[in-house]
Curated annotation (Swiss-Prot):
Keyword Ion transport: no
Keywords per UniProt: ATP-binding, Disulfide bond, Kinase, Magnesium, Nucleotide-binding, Rhamnose metabolism, Transferase
Biological processes, Gene Ontology terms: glycerol metabolic process; rhamnose catabolic process
Binding site for substrate: G83, H236, D237, T238, N296
The enzyme's E.C. designation: 2.7.1.5
Assigned GO CC terms: cytosol
Protein name in the entry: Rhamnulokinase
Self-association state and partner proteins as the record states: Monomer.
Nucleus in keyword set: no
Annotated disulfide bonds: C68-C222, C353-C370, C413-C417
Catalytically driven reaction(s): L-rhamnulose + ATP = L-rhamnulose 1-phosphate + ADP + H(+)
Amino acid sequence: MTFRNCVAVDLGASSGRVMLARYERECRSLTLREIHRFKNGLHSQNGYVTWNVDSLESAIRLGLNKVCEEGIRIDSIGIDTWGVDFVLLDQQGQRVGLPVAYRDSRTNGLMAQAQQQLGKRDIYQRSGIQFLPFNTLYQLRALTEQQPELIPHIAHALLMPDYFSYRLTGKMNWEYTNATTTQLVNINSDDWDESLLAWSGANKAWFGRPTHPGNVIGHWICPQGNEIPVVAVASHDTASAVIASPLNGSRAAYLSSGTWSLMGFESQTPFTNDTALAANITNEGGAEGRYRVLKNIMGLWLLQRVLQERQINDLPALIAATQALPACRFIINPNDDRFINPEAMCSEIQAACRETAQPIPESDAELARCIFDSLALLYADVLHELAQLRGEDFSQLHIVGGGCQNTLLNQLCADACGIRVIAGPVEASTLGNIGIQLMTLDELNNVDDFRQVVSTTANLTTFTPNPDSEIAHYVAQIHSTRQTKELCA
């Protein structure tokens, strides 16, 4: 038997994990084992909302060392994280300034300024990326305007996964799928757009040319002295999650469900027409030259904040209580930018209901019901938008990531969208990370080959739409006429 041992470092906005994958070549089986899981979150530092990258690096190294201590020979390592955020380095590789998080308010007003000065359509034609106020384009402008004293010291700007790869290997890389989330990569050249970079105030010398997934960045030397390849995987966590989505045919859509919900489809060509611009559709880079045509939805961030504020620890009990409540009594638009990072999420949700003359969700279960129903309805809106954009309906929706464990939300999604939902795999970002490593090690041919492995080894659950459900009736009778506000457009 031939085995490969690959390690995936998967960092999300609320948690991180170091996972060991064991691939058996002869039977094409893949098993995952969690080695180390740790918390991640936002911090306040010198007036900014930041990430504790030192703590994250320590947790990554701890997880890697645990694998080595077990005597396991690691064949490769890959790192994926969230998008848009970056770390600045000087000529000696030391950090400059703070690793500011995308939920910081420093970019307020800059997206509108860019649209006024450069033209909204021109920015979109160049980048193909949706307008979000925290895109790297606006973060860099905020940096150069508000902290000009840092500029002379900056030699390099590394996106989060590239920074952690650099810390392990000493080698710098700018991975393509994550680079596209910045709104700074030209969609035609796959290189940094000079006009957009110039507006941001950043120096092009801070960046190297983006590289597509599948190359070896460098090597991490483990405590035992072995040199282990660190692979540039599809380092944007959604790009990795899509790789592990067992999409079957052109009529399959995906929903990567976590802190954010990313709903979309794969395409060989981008969509940058006026319809796509009006819908704020993004064309993020994927593996093998594919595009992830998708839309950002605020996702389970709202629930995470409610759980935190109400100090709720038993999520299954909350979901059970939520399921017993009637549907669609409290409806908000999760994509309203008032929910990006409010001081108190519960109060913000209640205020949104009050302002629209609805009942006010008071209990924990009512707040959760409001979030789940509102998300499912927004999923239906976005799926319809995506189908109209490409001129063809979808036959199934694959929900992947941690959020796919929420069976109530899965069923609500199936009912609201009127589509068959296949939930799983849960650890989609980790699996997609592993998939690129296995391709780099010449164990698998391509993404479609890897998806066959996922289909046969992952635990998948199907949810059939119920046209007689409360939310299905709501969609048919009321929801189809409502107007929704674009997220940050």
